[in-house]
Swiss-Prot record:
This protein's name: Histidine ammonia-lyase
UniProt keyword list: Cytoplasm, Histidine metabolism, Lyase
MF terms in GO: histidine ammonia-lyase activity
Gene name of this polypeptide: hutH
Gene3D superfamilies, A to Z: Fumarase/aspartase (Central domain), Fumarase/aspartase (N-terminal domain)
Pathway: Amino-acid degradation; L-histidine degradation into L-glutamate; N-formimidoyl-L-glutamate from L-histidine: step 1/3
UniProt similarity note: Belongs to the PAL/histidase family.
HAMAP family to which the protein is assigned, alphabetical: His_ammonia_lyase
Sites of the 5-imidazolinone (Ala-Gly) crosslink: 143-145
Classification lineage: Bacteria, Pseudomonadati, Pseudomonadota, Gammaproteobacteria, Enterobacterales
Amino acid sequence: MNTMTLTPGQLSLSQLYDVWRHPVQLRLDASAIDGINASVACVNDIVAEGRTAYGINTGFGLLAQTRIADEDLQNLQRSLVLSHAAGVGDPLDDAMVRLIMVLKINSLARGFSGIRLSVIEALIALVNAGVYPLIPAKGSVGASGDLAPLAHLSLTLLGEGKARWQGEWLPAQAALKKAGLEPVALAAKEGLALLNGTQASTAFALRGLFEAQELFASAVVCGALTTEAVLGSCRPFDARIHAARGQQGQIDVARLFRHLLTDTSAIAESHHHCHKVQDPYSLRCQPQVMGACLTQLRQTKEVLLAEANAVSDNPLVFAEAGEVISGGNFHAEPVAMAADNLALAIAEIGALSERRITLMMDKHMSQLPPFLVKNGGVNSGFMIAQVTAAALASENKALAHPHSVDSLPTSANQEDHVSMAPAAGRRLWEMAANTRGVIAVEWLAACQGIDLREGLTSSPLLEQARQTLRERVAHYTQDRFFAPDIECATTLLAQGALQRLVPDFM
């Protein structure tokens, strides 16, 4: 099991990916402890001195002007968690819950939240024991933070709600007991610190980014395979073309294609002196389109990595000055916009792949048998597989609609502009699945096209991509049940079968 020492505010993208993919044993770096304790001392001083501070001894949202008596402060925090656990929908899977918890721990341990070390350690214990709170997928608008999802997370700390332990849903009390853990009682400010924050939104978008990276790499490999299958030219990937424009994403994508499409390709050599002047845009403009997508991925990474290491609580405790200041770091607009931009990239990756599939279907454009099968008429070949790809690509056009431009006021207009970041991030998962299906069809089609080149081989890396598929999916000599082949290719893509052929591009 992966062991990770958490230095608050310094999580890397690779660490976040590992948290998403695998269970982790988490340890808090000792350097965080003084800051955590100082923020708690500041909160305690405010309570002891009778000063009024939002979230410490007041109500919440529109009820912020209501002063809460000292004897009710513990009950205030517990009531907050219980009342805000109002999410709906299917439970998030363990990987997403684990990522949300680690993001929450990272934020709280920065020392601006006024939450005791013992509560942070209780969250770490949940992660390490594999106790995963039941968090419904829906119910947050991404301001004031992800209140409902984080309330469901916090329920388990209190011994309320349900949690999954070793694959079994249990009452939270029972799950804690089996894991050898105890519920906690929350002190002043702690319930609000747990609930306020953008951790669910950020986790949703991070998953979208992780999947988009795999899709991008897979699409570049399949685009290179298709270029070979239809006897496309390598000249559009010449470094001089892309240097003249100066778009870094485009320059880097062209380099990836040159890495894949080498001079050792017998296919490329076979038509080196052919009469064709230019290829269709879906081949020739791959660096331009995929380069723009890569730029979006990189910008999304920058925003999400900053947010993953951010303090998005409210109010914030500035212990050195002895102040608690209300602000709006819980507003997930940066995450929503990043997710919207990522949606455009995922949609375009799939759209370009679908165009290349269609190109291979047309015998006049591809110089291959219609629908990539011999004895056409008796055999339909890839005819309907292309239709499936078109359906998936078209779905993504609707799903790419921006969420960050939407807003509905909540909390009796106290929270009158919200980000819709959770929905912006969550739809990326469906879009990624659609695009993966499109790329799977292209992989199948491109390998079939190369097979039909009568023994000619491609470059070593592309032959490796073809061999990986052919170990699981046979060449089509005649029609057969097609869906299992798409499913097989999709699974291989999700496992990174093609991604590992591409050098790091982020």
